[in-house]
């Protein structure tokens, strides 16, 4: 007999019991996609051992969803080979929005999707058992996949002695690490989304491939809900709204580096202004460090040896330089310009730094995935005893910031990775426990992500949920046990001795460009007044009303409002439509009556009409709406 732990309970099981055997004794086990054993995701066919700790996962769990989609990708490949036997499958990973599979020697269009989906449905209905095969040698694996040059290339690159596995379902077999569903049966609903060109391993010099994207779900209902969400997301696409609302553009000459227009800069300045006020009140001091620094700095930080392929480098007077991909090393140098005492701690240093990181062109996407962006970093230097309290302070700051934008969020605590190289076991345990206690005391829901911490310390990731329930990883709080030591940072402790400070590295927006993209989609371009690129548009009925309109606009601009005047020759109704299409918060129509009675005719972008309003009431209400950072209009 062996003993295993599941859901904090101990079970005695016969030797040789598999996770599937054990699962069969649990209610609703047919929903299980896989099992996490000792923090590693496994197939249900895995044999259990003495002392194993296990947790079964379903489609609603991130691990279970990945298994489900991975098997769905194999079903797609099997369907393609049934319909186009000469196609050559290459790789088919799970991605955020579903999965894709790349094929060589295949020519299809979206007109073929229905036929492919029907074949996928047939494969699912056949309920093939998904079986794992472990090859005895690299030679055996090469023989199995000898007709597929892409698989052969992957196998040859594997280190000698590494386990090589494949998964089969019916007549189809694919080189794969797994894990997978026990059978093709649970995959009930498919939808192929689009096809595109791709290159083997993302290299334009290599073979051209056809990439097919898809999604899959356990039920048709879930698929329909997802497709509705995709339709809504398309309406909110920040790339489309960004151009329509004249916020930003992208140019071929600078892929991944957006151009912000005047209207976009108004939103940008509002975001940054809010961030600065928030941090000043929280006791942060702001710095600015250079974008270009020499190789010697990046060697000390470890970036030159570990991150150089993602950095932009150049030579100046025969010396290597790099544009910074991260703000951290610059802050380390700032810290060293002064002597420090424990009495100054926590020392909170913030920077909105412009960083550059190389991304392949195929991965670029609007403001969400770029090569140049601004990151709102802060580095907090403190003693080990202050970690828990300061982490809690940061979590309170997180709550205040995201609630200001009406964004819900959840937190993930990532613990020590298996191959962590920095710090002792004891230090990792203390650091992780301090972060976990802070999370508990913040009363914010969180989950533990075992083994996903950085090599230099545990971290808390912040995942926000937008208006259509999509989640985005934005901010992070990381305990860094590496850089302070690497840069030989010191402070004088309470005993008068020199010590190395602990450092909390955190970003709240993360990439400000990405956060702005999220906000555009979250608000669907309909920004609250304090963030809006155009607060008020004054619309004249006739040319004779232009002087009064301009006088009002000038006065309101002095109060901090963004005001424009439309005195064009268009009809009043066309002017109103134009303003509403640009999501202007308030339109003020000015004609003879309004001038004679000294009143205003107000119209909101939701088409609410408020006639005969006094200027004082209008301005006082808008000032309250703007200054309170209200998410909803007060008129």
Swiss-Prot record:
It catalyses: tRNA(Thr) + L-threonine + ATP = L-threonyl-tRNA(Thr) + AMP + diphosphate + H(+). Pfam families: HGTP_anticodon (PF03129), TGS (PF02824), tRNA-synt_2b (PF00587), tRNA_SAD (PF07973). GO terms for cellular component: cytoplasm. The keyword ATP-binding applies. Zn(2+) binds at residues 328, 379, 505. SUPFAM superfamilies: Class II aaRS ABD-related, Class II aaRS and biotin synthetases, MoaD/ThiS, ThrRS/AlaRS common domain. Keywords: Aminoacyl-tRNA synthetase, ATP-binding, Cytoplasm, Ligase, Metal-binding, Nucleotide-binding, Protein biosynthesis, RNA-binding, tRNA-binding, Zinc. Belongs to the class-II aminoacyl-tRNA synthetase family. This is Threonine--tRNA ligase. It comes from Chlamydia abortus (strain DSM 27085 / S26/3). The lineage of its organism: Bacteria, Pseudomonadati, Chlamydiota, Chlamydiia, Chlamydiales.
């Amino acid at each position: 007999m062996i003993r295993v732990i599941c859901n904090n309970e101990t079970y005695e099981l016969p030797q040789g019991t598999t996770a599937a055997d054990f699962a069969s004794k649990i209610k609703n086990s047919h929903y299980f996609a896989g099992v996490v054993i000792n923090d590693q995701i496994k197939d249900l066919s895995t044999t259990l051992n003495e002392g194993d700790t296990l947790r079964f996962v379903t489609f609603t769990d991130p691990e279970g969803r990945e298994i489900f989609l991975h098997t769905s990708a194999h079903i797609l490949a099997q369907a393609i080979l049934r319909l186009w036997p000469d196609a050559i499958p290459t790789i088919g990973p799970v991605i955020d929005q579903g999965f894709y599979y790349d094929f060589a020697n295949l020519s299809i269009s979206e007109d073929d999707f229905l036929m492919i989906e029907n074949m996928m449905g047939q494969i699912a209905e056949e309920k093939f058992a998904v079986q794992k095969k472990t090859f005895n040698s690299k030679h055996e694996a090469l023989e199995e996949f000898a007709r597929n040059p892409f698989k052969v290339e992957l196998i040859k690159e594997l280190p000698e002695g590494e386990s090589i596995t494949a998964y089969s379902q019916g007549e189809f077999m694919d080189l794969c690490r797994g894990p997978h569903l026990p059978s093709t049966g649970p995959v009930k609903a498919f939808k192929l989304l689009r096809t595109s060109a791709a290159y083997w391993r993302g290299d334009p010099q290599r073979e051209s491939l056809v990439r097919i994207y898809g999604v899959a779900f356990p039920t048709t209902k879930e698929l329909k809900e997802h497709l509705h969400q995709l339709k809504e997301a398309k309406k909110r696409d920040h790339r489309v709204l960004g151009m329509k609302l004249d916020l930003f553009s992208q140019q071929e000459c600078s892929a991944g580096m957006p151009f912000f227009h005047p209207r976009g800069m108004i939103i940008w300045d509002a975001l940054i202004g809010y961030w600065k006020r928030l941090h000043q009140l929280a006791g942060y001091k702001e710095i600015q460090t250079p974008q270009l620094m020499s190789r010697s700095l990046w060697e000390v930080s470890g970036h030159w040896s570990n991150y150089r392929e993602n950095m932009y480098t150049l030579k100046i007077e025969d010396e290597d330089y790099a544009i910074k991909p991260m703000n951290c090393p610059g802050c380390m140098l700032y810290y060293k310009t002064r002597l420090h005492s424990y009495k100054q701690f926590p020392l909170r240093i913030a920077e909105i730094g412009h960083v550059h990181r190389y991304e392949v062109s195929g991965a670029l996407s609007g403001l969400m995935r770029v090569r140049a962006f601004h990151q709102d970093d802060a580095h907090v230097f403190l003693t080990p005893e202050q970690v828990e309290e300061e982490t809690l302070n940061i979590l309170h700051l997180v709550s205040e910031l995201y609630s200001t934008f009406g964004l819900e969020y959840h937190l993930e605590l990532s613990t020590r990775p298996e191959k962590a190289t920095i710090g002792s076991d004891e230090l990792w345990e203390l650091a992780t426990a301090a972060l976990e206690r802070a999370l508990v005391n913040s009363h914010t829901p969180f989950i533990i992500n075992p083994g996903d911490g950085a090599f230099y310390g545990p971290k808390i990731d912040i995942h926000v949920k937008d208006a259509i329930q999509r989640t985005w990883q934005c901010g992070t709080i990381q305990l860094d046990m590496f850089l302070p030591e690497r840069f030989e940072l010191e402070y004088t402790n309470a005993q008068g001795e020199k010590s190395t400070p602990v450092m909390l590295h955190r970003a709240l927006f993360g990439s400000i460009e990405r956060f702005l993209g999220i906000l555009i989609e979250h608000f669907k371009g309909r920004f609250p007044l304090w963030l809006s690129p155009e607060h008020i548009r004054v619309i004249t009925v006739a040319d004779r009303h232009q002087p009064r309109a301009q006088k009002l606009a000038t006065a309101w601009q002095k109060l901090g409002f963004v005001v424009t005047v439309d005195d064009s020759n268009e009809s009043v109704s066309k002017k109103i439509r134009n303003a509403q299409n640009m999501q202007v918060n308030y339109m003020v129509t000015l004609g003879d009556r309004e001038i004679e009675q000294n009143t205003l005719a107000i119209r909101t972008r939701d088409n609410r009409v408020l006639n005969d309003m006094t200027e004082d009431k209008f301005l006082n209400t808008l000032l309250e709406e703007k200054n309170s950072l209200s998410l909803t209009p007060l008129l």
